[in-house]
Amino acid sequence: MRRKLLFMILSFLFFFAIIFTLKCFSEEAATFVPKNYVIAYYFHGTFRCPTCHKLEQYSKEAIEANFKNELTSGKIVFKTVNVDEKANEHFVNDYQLYTRSLVISLVRGGKEEKFKNLTKIWEYVGNKQRFYDYVWDEIAAFLKEL
């Protein structure tokens, strides 16, 4: 009888310790999510021409090359979104999209405060460095507002 009671008590304590540990880890993980950040969306359709692929590639490269720390910390998030998919159609109206686009969005306290469609990516796609500089300047300006 004593062994059963001891086993039950130890089992309860072990179970309680596991629950407590998991709760601590989940709270710790939640603290690493920044409340203020910049999202860089590259919007495309299902059909993608070579220039569209290049726009996405340059956008991603410009952000990864210039903002490694911010990407790692979550201050910048890069997302590629197909607006032809039903779940993503709202972005066309949300950001007044009329073509393939790179849009940056400033989020504070979990709410979008402002956004900017970087329309000059089409103008600069033929000059990689100018493209990178343009994307860097625009994102850096948004980061200053965090």
Where do the protein language model's features map onto the residues?
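Thiol-based oxidoreductase modules, predominantly thioredoxin-like and allied folds used
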Residues: 71-87
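Boundary at the C-terminal end of the N-terminal hydrophobic targeting segment
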Residues: 24-26
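Positively charged n-region of N-terminal signal peptides that target proteins for export
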Residues: 1-5
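Bacterial N-terminal signal peptides
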Residues: 9-20
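Non-catalytic, surface beta->alpha helical segment in thiol-disulfide oxidoreductase systems
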Residues: 104-146
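Local sequence-structure signature of Cys/Sec-based thiol-disulfide redox active-site neighborhoods
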Residues: 33-65
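Structural micro-motif
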Residues: 87, 92-107, 113
